[in-house]
Regions:
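Charged, often Cys/His-bearing segments associated with DNA-binding zinc-finger transcription factors
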Residues: 1-56, 110-115, 350-392
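Short coil/turn segments at secondary-structure boundaries
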Residues: 33-36, 57-61, 85, 89
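Short alpha-helical segments in extracytoplasmic peptidoglycan/chitin-binding modules
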Residues: 38, 69, 83
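Structural recognition of short helix-loop-helix hairpins that underlie histone-fold modules
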Residues: 43-61, 77-78, 276-286
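Short, well-ordered secondary-structure "scaffold" segments embedded in the functional core
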Residues: 79-392
Length: 392
């Protein structure tokens, strides 16, 4: 809330303002259920957007009401017409206010969806304080993966957005840290694009791509090749936790490594999980927004995700998904094994290119296997196996 002293004078703004007042000062649980954040976080969000990102109130609509309208759109998947009816505003007013909030959130996203200063030089407590991973993965700085979001594709290029299931989607490449915050996102790639090609494009062409510093690396799944700065699992070896739950504990060093790698890398799956669960607009199978607007909305929800994580450590959704270590988004292991075989074929066909050293001490990405990282994987596997009782 921006100016508490004006609260008593804000009771003449009609049904919309009365609704917001109830959310801000009534039940905190009701505020959380409707706006997807608690009252304190909502007030902090309004203040930040006003003071740092240029969101302004007007004579008829205060900032809190505009932000609440936007949060109901992305958090509850409400239409503009439903919002206009609930807040007793004209369609034009609602559209204008939603656009203003979206614009402010996109400015915030430019600051929020990147590593913090010193991020790669300090160790996240979640990693250091867990002896399952420390010190074995001491140089790991996060996890990387892609996920698919339904999309209304442009008519001129609709087929490019149809993936294996023939549903139109866009690919979202994201990197998260072990605090379940996004530190990079590239949104809007057609769903047919291969994960490795998306990463290659971003790493070579995007100026703000957070290349891992020398000696550091991200965890990736078998859809990406293991190379300097990107540590993947052993292929054609059990990997996902549910495979070990069904088939018994690891039986060799490679399985020991894969199980621990899968457990640690699940942070990206859980980050995707809480993000999609909180912002219900992302679940829409057939989005009603055009591609450009949809990309902006998806990006805004990722920025909101980070804001909530920083503002409210005990957010119920984050707490729930922190505990779901065995969650992963793929679900179809047979399909995943087929994907791995295709990836290996692509890796063999990929020609190694020299990219120079223009990354200021960071590692340029080349989608080819790397013996040094494979050696690191072997060493970590051997170290993990020393404390693991194998059946031989």
């Amino acid at each position: 809330m921006l100016k508490p002293e004006r609260l008593l004078h804000r009771t003449d703004r009609g049904a919309g303002w009365n609704h917001v007042q109830q959310l801000m000062h009534g039940s905190d649980q009701q505020c959380y259920d409707i706006l997807r954040m608690n009252q304190r976080t909502f007030q902090d969000l309004c203040k930040m957007l006003a003071t740092r990102y240029g969101l302004q109130e007007t004579q008829n609509v205060y900032i809190e009401e505009a932000v609440a309208m936007f949060l109901e759109v992305v958090g509850q998947d409400k239409t503009v017409r439903v919002i206009a009816q609930r807040y007793q505003r004209s369609l034009d007013t609602v559209k204008r206010k939603l656009g203003e909030v979206l614009s402010a959130l996109l400015k915030f996203a430019a600051d929020a969806l990147k590593p913090e200063d010193g991020e790669f030089t300090r160790v996240c407590p979640a990693l250091r304080n867990d002896d399952r991973y420390w010190p074995f993965f001491k140089d790991c700085i996060g996890a990387l993966d892609g996920t698919h979001i339904s999309v209304r594709p442009p008519k001129r290029n609709a087929e490019a957005y149809r993936g294996r299931k023939q549903e139109p989607t866009m690919n979202v490449l994201a990197i998260c840290n072990f605090d379940m915050k996004f530190i990079y996102a590239y949104v809007g790639v057609p769903g047919r694009a291969h994960d490795t090609k998306v990463l290659t494009y971003c790493a070579r062409n995007e100026p703000f791509f957070p290349h891992p510093p020398n000696g550091k690396y991200y965890l990736v799944d078998a859809g990406y090749p293991t190379r300097t700065g990107y540590l993947g699992p052993y292929r054609r070896v059990r990997y996902h936790l549910d495979q070990f739950n069904r088939g018994g504990p690891p039986t060799n060093t490679r399985e020991v490594f894969n199980r621990r790698h899968s457990s640690l890398r699940s942070v990206i799956e859980r980050t995707f999980g809480v993000w999609k669960a909180k912002w219900r607009i992302l679940d829409r199978r057939h989005p009603k927004y055009g591609l450009i607007k949809w990309i902006k909305l998806v990006t805004a929800t990722m920025a909101l995700h980070n804001f909530i994580r920083d503002s409210h450590r005990e957010d119920n959704d984050f707490v729930h998904w922190q505990r779901r270590e065995e969650y992963h988004t793929h679900g179809d292991n047979d399909e995943e094994e087929r994907d791995e075989e295709e990836d290996e074929d692509e890796d063999e066909d990929e020609e190694e290119e020299e990219d120079g050293d223009g990354h200021g001490g960071h590692i340029p990405y080349e989608p080819t296997g790397d013996r040094a990282m494979e050696g690191l994987r072997d060493r970590i596997g051997n170290e993990l196996s020393r404390g693991y009782r194998l059946p031989y």
